[in-house]
From Swiss-Prot:
Function: Shows nociceptive, edema-inducing and kininogenase activity with release of kallidin from low molecular weight kininogen. The cleavage occurs at Met-Lys bonds.
UniProt key word Hydrolase: yes
PANTHER family with a match to the protein in the record: NATTERIN-3-LIKE, NATTERIN-4
Lineage of the species this protein comes from: Eukaryota, Metazoa, Chordata, Craniata, Vertebrata
Tissue specificity remark: Expressed by the venom gland.
Protein's name according to its UniProt entry: Natterin-2
Keyword Amino-acid biosynthesis set for record: no
A GO cellular component annotation in the UniProt record: extracellular region
Signal peptide: 1-18
Species whose genome carries this gene: Thalassophryne nattereri (Copper Joe toadfish)
Length: 376
């Protein structure tokens, strides 16, 4: 008797669209990661250094935001030192000196009014542990100390203060963001092939004395994941548009599809659930029980990339920067049916010609790997 599976039909049901069933999570490295950094002084002003033009002094000068430890002040190109107020005096240093840099001018910085120690939302601080903020008054850059209800600045070698000032803030009113010019670095990337895993099982019994063919249908919802983890923060609650080719890791090799544009409701990540169905027609020998299982293999890969990240703020202001990150994906490589060994469940004596109808245990049979789903 030929015990092969007579019919195997693999169907992909309910292909979900990103617009309909998209589940997302924000994809970013840390909550506080931005393009605004404190860079150690190196004798020259780095690109993107945050500055003001102080026209009160004569001659007028450009002052760059700097700090020594947590004390904010201004960096002078005349002596390559950070000048800051501390302990009633004007201090200056080039050793513990850091300059505030806004790489590619990506963060939208604004000066907003404060008074008597108050600071507006999203004010730029000098340290995470100390509540000292970057500020400026009529006479130049300084430090806002809310605990002392004022802005301190240097003047004629001394520490001076004022209750009227402006604080440096980051505008976070982003209404749209886009990622384009995505370039994957595939060299050295290995596709991690998952072990075949049983998703569903079903048992079919034949209590009769003749072989019968029974049809078994197994279904399983399997989730796939695509995520672009970038080094720059991805803002909550705004649409992210990603224009990129999509890496296909469903086989052992890695292929990049043609470029497509995708919109995500929150961040640059999506999870799609696809319903897979396996229908198997199995000849079941008399007085035997056969188990049919649905098996799936899921592949994973982490692929580094570089890209251009563009933000649009309320009011129409746009900023852009280069970024890098990792594309992480989980994809279904294949689903198939296994007909496992059959076991005897009845008494062969109940059937005439038992010796010719009762067979040995059924060997495991597999279906072929299905074709890739449409659109992948």
């Amino acid at each position: 008797m030929n015990l092969s599976v007579l019919l195997v039909t693999l169907l992909l049901l309910s292909w979900t669209s990103a617009e309909k069933d998209l589940k997302v999570r924000v994809a970013r490295s840390t909550n506080d990661e931005t393009n605004l950094h404190w860079v150690k002084c190196g004798g020259s002003v780095p690109d993107g250094a945050v500055s003001i033009r102080n026209t009160y002094v004569s001659p007028a000068r450009t002052e760059y935001v700097c700090k020594c430890f947590c004390q904010a002040g201004y960096y002078s190109t005349k002596d390559s030192k950070c000048h800051y107020p501390y302990g009633t005096k004007e201090m200056a240093t080039s050793t513990n000196c850091y300059i505030l840099v806004n790489r590619d001018n990506f963060e939208l910085l604004e000066w907003k009014d404060g008074y008597a120690g108050s600071v507006p939302d999203n004010a730029v601080s000098t340290c995470k542990t100390n509540k000292i903020y970057v500020g400026k008054g009529a006479y130049g850059l300084g430090k806002i100390e809310p605990a002392n209800h004022c802005l301190y600045y240097v003047w004629d070698g001394a520490e001076t203060w004022t209750k009227t000032y402006q604080a440096l803030t980051m505008n976070k009113d982003v209404i749209e963001q886009a990622m384009k010019d995505v370039k994957y670095q595939t060299e050295g990337v290995t596709v991690i092939k998952g072990k075949p895993e049983v998703m569903r099982r079903s048992t079919v019994n034949n209590q009769h004395c003749k072989e019968v063919t029974k049809t078994v249908t197994l279904t399983k919802d399997i989730s796939t994941d695509e995520r672009w983890d970038v080094t720059n923060s991805v803002t909550f609650g705004v649409t992210t548009t990603v224009t990129a080719g999509i890496p296909d890791v469903s086989s052992a090799s890695l292929e990049i599809s043609m470029q497509a544009t995708m919109d995500f409701a929150h961040g640059a990540s999506k999870t799609e659930t696809q319903s897979y169905m396996v229908t198997v027609s199995v000849p079941v020998p008399p007085k035997q029980s056969c188990t049919v299982s649905m098996v799936a293999q899921v592949n994973k890969a982490d692929i580094p990339f570089t890209a251009t990240l563009i933000r649009t703020y309320r009011g129409g202001k746009k900023t852009q920067t280069t970024t890098k990150g990792v594309y992480r994906t989980i994809q279904v490589a294949e689903t198939h049916a296994d007909v496992e060994q059959c076991t005897i469940i009845g008494d062969a004596k109940d059937c005439p010609n038992a010796s010719s109808t009762i067979t040995t245990l059924r060997p495991k049979l597999k279906s072929k790997k299905p074709a890739k789903p449409a659109g992948k």
